């Protein structure tokens, strides 16, 4: 109800400053009785996916709460699951500012944040405090100064630390803002990473006496051949799920608009069709062998349904949440 007024004020500010102010307020109320200020009632729409029970199929995508500082406040808004991160083994400041831009006319965002986060240990301490009743995903990545050839070591370090506290673990190999990261999506590099992750998952399952599923997050900028190869690798290594998709480098839908020339990943409405098409192609290729979490430009009930009709078992929002606020959660969960 109040979001259009709040949004108008926030959109007068630099996007990253607006984000910081919003999270400052959410941090104040998270894990306190004042969570009622953001709480909204949504119906239960149970879904089982990756062996986990979700109270509804709508989640918050990674990138909004990178350090897990506002899990309970965000959870009070009605999300069935929340994905925190991307987090790296060591804290890092990310790329130089400005690094976040609104393409308001297209309801899009361009970011080149560069995995800015306070490190995996800080995130784990926050996760330990949460009372969120939904499924918590933890999205992990590599530090910028870790050579790509040693990148898998960063993922294994993070897995070790987050495994006891995660509902599922998301492997981010598709951000366009960490040099060389997307090369891990292909060929031998992907197979090498998936084998190491699967072995680590088996080791941690024995150690902690619980199985935590692993999902891999992929880019939308994939050729048919690359998509087929990725699907084949995910199945061969018994990965539990795939998150499709991350942001795009394609700018054809925002040509001529403000900030269209900024480097970074584009999200929001301009990503909607291409991410849905990747989900559709992936679904055909996987033939039900592992579930898809659909993300990319969901800004309405119709857009969420399109992702699910294309083959997604669960969906996530991020940019749509920025542009439309908590009401979008209620609309999607109520009518999906």
Curated annotation (Swiss-Prot):
It is an enzyme of class 1 (oxidoreductase). Belongs to the dihydroorotate dehydrogenase family. Type 2 subfamily. PANTHER family: DIHYDROOROTATE DEHYDROGENASE (QUINONE), MITOCHONDRIAL, DIHYDROOROTATE DEHYDROGENASE (QUINONE), MITOCHONDRIAL-RELATED. Pathway: Pyrimidine metabolism; UMP biosynthesis via de novo pathway; orotate from (S)-dihydroorotate (quinone route): step 1/1. Keywords: Cell membrane, Flavoprotein, FMN, Membrane, Oxidoreductase, Pyrimidine biosynthesis. It is found in: Cell membrane. One of its GO terms (cellular component) is cytoplasm. Its cofactor is FMN. One of its GO terms (biological process) is 'de novo' UMP biosynthetic process. Catalyzes the conversion of dihydroorotate to orotate with quinone as electron acceptor. The active site is at residue 175. FMN binds at residues 62-66, 86, 139, 172, 217, 245, 268, 297, 318-319. GO terms for molecular function: dihydroorotate dehydrogenase (quinone) activity. Pfam families: DHO_dh (PF01180). Binds 1 FMN per subunit. It catalyses: (S)-dihydroorotate + a quinone = orotate + a quinol. Its EC number is 1.3.5.2. It comes from the Bacteria. It is a peripheral membrane protein. This is Dihydroorotate dehydrogenase (quinone). NCBIfam families: PRK05286.1-1 (NF003644), PRK05286.1-2 (NF003645), PRK05286.1-4 (NF003646), PRK05286.2-5 (NF003652), pyrD_sub2 (TIGR01036).
């Amino acid at each position: 109800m109040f979001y259009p007024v709040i949004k108008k004020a926030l959109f007068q500010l630099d996007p990253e400053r607006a984000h910081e102010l919003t999270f400052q307020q959410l941090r104040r109320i998270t894990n306190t009785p004042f969570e009622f200020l953001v709480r909204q009632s949504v119906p239960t729409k149970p879904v089982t996916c990756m062996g986990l029970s979700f109270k509804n199929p709508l989640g918050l995508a990674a990138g909004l709460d990178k350090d897990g500082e506002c899990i309970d406040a965000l959870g009070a808004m009605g999300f069935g699951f929340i994905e925190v991160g991307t987090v790296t083994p060591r804290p890092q400041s990310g790329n130089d500012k400005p690094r976040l831009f609104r393409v308001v006319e297209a309801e899009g965002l361009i970011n080149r944040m560069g995995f800015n986060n306070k490190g995996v240990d800080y995130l784990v301490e926050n996760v330990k405090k949460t009372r969120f009743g939904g499924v918590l995903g933890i999205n992990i990545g590599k530090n910028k100064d870790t050579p790509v050839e040693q990148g898998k070591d960063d993922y294994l370090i993070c897995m070790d630390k987050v495994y006891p506290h995660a509902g599922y673990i998301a492997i981010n190999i598709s951000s366009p803002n960490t040099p060389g990261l997307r090369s891990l999506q292909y060929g031998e590099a992907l197979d090498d990473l998936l084998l190491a992750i699967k072995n680590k998952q088996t080791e941690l399952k024995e150690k902690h006496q619980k199985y935590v599923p692993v999902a891999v997050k992929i880019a939308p900028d994939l050729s048919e051949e690359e998509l087929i190869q990725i699907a084949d690798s995910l199945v061969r290594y018994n990965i539990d799920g795939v998150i499709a998709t991350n942001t795009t480098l394609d700018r054809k839908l925002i040509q001529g608009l403000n900030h269209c020339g900024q480097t970074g990943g584009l999200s929001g409405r301009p990503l909607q069709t291409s991410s849905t098409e990747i989900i559709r192609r992936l679904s055909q290729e996987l033939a039900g062998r592992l579930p898809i979490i659909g993300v990319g430009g969901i800004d309405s009930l119709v857009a969420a349904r399109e992702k699910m009709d294309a083959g997604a078992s669960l969906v996530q929002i991020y940019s749509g949440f920025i542009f439309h606020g908590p009401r979008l959660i209620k609309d999607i969960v109520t009518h999906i």
